[in-house]
Amino acid sequence: MIEVPQHLYTRQADILHLETLIQELPDEAQVELHLTDGSRITGTVSIRPSVQVFRDSEGAQGFNAAVRIDDQQHPEHAHYIWMDRIAQVVHLGSA
C-alpha cells in the first residue's frame, strides 16, 4: 500500500471532489481509470475507498484517498491509485 500521498488537500472543494470520485467506485465495480498522466488502468475495485487524514514530512495535515484496483488481466496484481490521479472513471460492470 502507498504510505504517504504526494498531495494533501484541505480546501472543502478539493475534498468534495475526492468524495465525488469515491461514489463512482463501489465495491467490486469493474472500471477503467483514466489517469491524469494519460495512462489507463482496468480492473476491479476491491473495496470502496474513503477519504483519510494524512500528515506530510513537515507535519502538515490534509486529506486524500487511495483505491485498490485488482488488475483485469492479472488479478493477482493490485494497483493502489491516489484519487487525485484519476481524471475519469469508466464503468464496465460489476464482478
What name fits each language-model region?
Residues 1-95:
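Conserved RNA-binding domains used in RNP assembly and mRNA/RNA metabolism
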